Amino acid sequence: MAKGVREKIKLVSSAGTGHFYTTTKNKRTKPEKLELKKFDPVVRQHVLYKEAKIK
């Protein structure tokens, strides 16, 4: 069986709360870093989440 192309990534809040989401992304089709606006429950607002590597 072939190994999947999708790699696990972590989306870290830019509000500095330490909150993060985990997701997967296809590195072959989207080599740039992912930035999404998502809800941060710590500050109770929609903030920018930036891609970081899962350690």
UniProtKB/Swiss-Prot annotation:
It comes from Pectobacterium atrosepticum (strain SCRI 1043 / ATCC BAA-672) (Erwinia carotovora subsp. atroseptica). One of its GO terms (cellular component) is cytosolic large ribosomal subunit. GO terms for biological process: translation. Keywords: Ribonucleoprotein, Ribosomal protein. Pfam families: Ribosomal_L33. Belongs to the bacterial ribosomal protein bL33 family. InterPro entries: Ribosomal_bL33 (IPR001705), Ribosomal_bL33_CS (IPR018264), Ribosomal_bL33_sf (IPR038584), Ribosomal_zn-bd (IPR011332). The lineage of its organism: Bacteria, Pseudomonadati, Pseudomonadota, Gammaproteobacteria, Enterobacterales. It comes from the Bacteria. One of its GO terms (molecular function) is structural constituent of ribosome. This is Large ribosomal subunit protein bL33. Transmembrane segments: none annotated.
